[in-house]
Amino acid sequence: MVNQAFDFKQFRKLQRVGDVFLPNCNIDVIKTKLIEVEKLIQNNIDNYEFTSIKTTKKNDKLIYLLDKNADNFIYDEFILRKINHNIKRIYKVKQADRNIIVNQIYNILKENPNYYIYRLDINSFYEAINRNKIVNKIFSSSVISVETKKLLQKVFERIQETEGLPRGLSISATLSELYMKDFDYSIVTTDGVFYYSRFVDDIIIFSIKELTFDYLNKTLQENTSLKFNNKKTKIIKMESNKQETFEYLGYQYVINKNSTKLKKDNINVNIAPKKINKIKTKIILSLLDYNKNKNFELLKNRFLFLTCTYPIKTSHQKISSYKNSGYLQGGLFYNYHSLSKDNASLKKLDEFVRNILFSNNIYSQALRLSDKKELAKYSFAVAYNRKFTRNYNAKRFEINNITRCWKYA
C-alpha cells in the first residue's frame, strides 16, 4: 500500500543528498520548510499555488523549471516529488535505464546479423502529448488520492502556455511513460520484434521481420497523439559484408561485418558526433570566458570537470560509499562507460584540444605557452582509461561557477 500523504514523514523519505547544495539551504532549513509545507497542504490545499514555476527557452522549446531562489521553492519541489512518487508507485511506472539499454544493444549486435534495426524519434514529444488523456486516467482512478489529484491540477493551472506536458518538470517524465504504455506494448508484441527500447522520445527496434514505416506510424497514431520525426528516422537492414552506422542515446555504433557472426572487435562504440561537438563547444566557451576574466584557475577546473568523473558529496559524508548511498554522479566515464577500447572519439577530442591550444586563433591567444602546456595535460582518453575521479564538495567548490559559461552549449 502506497502512503500518498503529503506530510513531513513522507517528504523526508524523498530527500536527496544534493538538497543541501541548494541556495540558502541546510538540513535544518529543509526540515523547517517541510514542516511548513505539511501545514499548508493540510490547512489550505485548495488555495495552494506553485509560484516558483518559471519558464525559459532552449532550442526554441519552452522549458519549465523551479526558481531555486523563490520563497516557495522547497514547498513546490517536495510537493512535485511526492506527486511524482505517488503516480510512479501506483502505476508501476519506471523509466528505462540508459546504461542497461546500451549494454543490451551491444550484446545484440554481437549476435547473428540477419535482422532489421529501426531508429525512430518522436517529434515535439512532451508538447504533443494529449494531456487530457492522462488527466482523465488519473482523475478517474479511485486509487490515486484526492490530494494528489488536486495538487496535480494546480500544476496544470500554472502551465497554461503549453497544451502538452511541461518539459523540464520531473512529473512529465513519469506522466509520459504512463501515456506511452499502450504504444510500447503494441510494438513489443508485434510479430518479429525481439528487442524494443524507448528512452523518452528515442526509440530503437530490432526485428527479424521487416516492419514498414507506415505500420509503425499507424501504431503510434492509434495509441497516442504523437508523430515521428521523419528526418531522424533510420531503417537498417543488417547484411553480411556491409558496414552500418547508427546513433542512439549519445553513442555512435559502427558495425563492420565480415562474417555471419560478428566479433567483438568488429563493433566500434564511440561518442555520437553531436555529443562530441557539444563537448568541443564547452571547451571553446571556456577559453572565450577566460579571455574576459583571465581566471586561469577557473579555466583549469573547467578542463578538469570535462575530462573526469565525479561523485558529489556534502561536507559531512564519506565519499567511499557514494555508489550505495544515493550520491550524485556524473562526468566522462559515467556518461560514456561503454566506449570501445580504442577510444577513437576521445582521441579526437584530445587532438582538438591540442589544435585549439597551439594554433593561431582567437580562442587561446590570451594564454601563455606554459598555461597551454598545462591545459594540454588534461586528456580525455587518459582520464577515461584510468577512470579518473575528482571528489567535489559543493560547499567549497563552485560547480555552478564552472558550468555557468556552458549554459546554452
Question: Predicted segment positions?
Answer:
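Right-hand nucleic-acid polymerase module
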Residues: 1-46, 73-81, 85-96, 103-108, ...
